Amino acid sequence: MSLEVGKKALDFLVKNSGARHNLEVDFFGGEPLMNFDVVKELVTYGRSLEEKYDKKFRFTLTTNGVLLNDDILEYANKEMSNLVLSIDGRKEIHDLMRPFRGGQGSYDVVADKFKKAADSRNQMNYYVRGTFTHNNLDFSEDVKHLARSMYLSISFARLLR
């Protein structure tokens, strides 16, 4: 998403929010960290709209974690009310569902980053989002794995085909 489109979306939200004071914006899809400079500019723009229109934005960032680093995490902890970490369960399932271009799995790249992210938020205001598909009909095993290995808050999303 371009900065211009993002600003228009925030303007539309404010214009159509009526008397509602609290507004929610979730950066997700297409991996927002690939366009993180625009995300930051939109948060700054949203903060300026708060003052101008007496609104309060709650921003959420959803990420697959591949590009997550200390600088992004520090920013997210300051500006994002919630952080959603998208992982598809235990290593063999996640690697099957989310390989890199060369076929290598991504679990080992993101698992430690997600643990660090959860710890940096004091185990609060973050969520783990897994995906239930035909490849993991035993998704309860993935939930147990995530709960045991690093996470407290787990949400479910159904992928329809």
What are these regions (language model features)?
Residues 29-30:
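Short acidic donor-binding/metal-coordinating loop in glycosyltransferase active sites
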Residues 3-26, 35-159:
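Radical SAM/AdoMet-radical enzyme domain recognition
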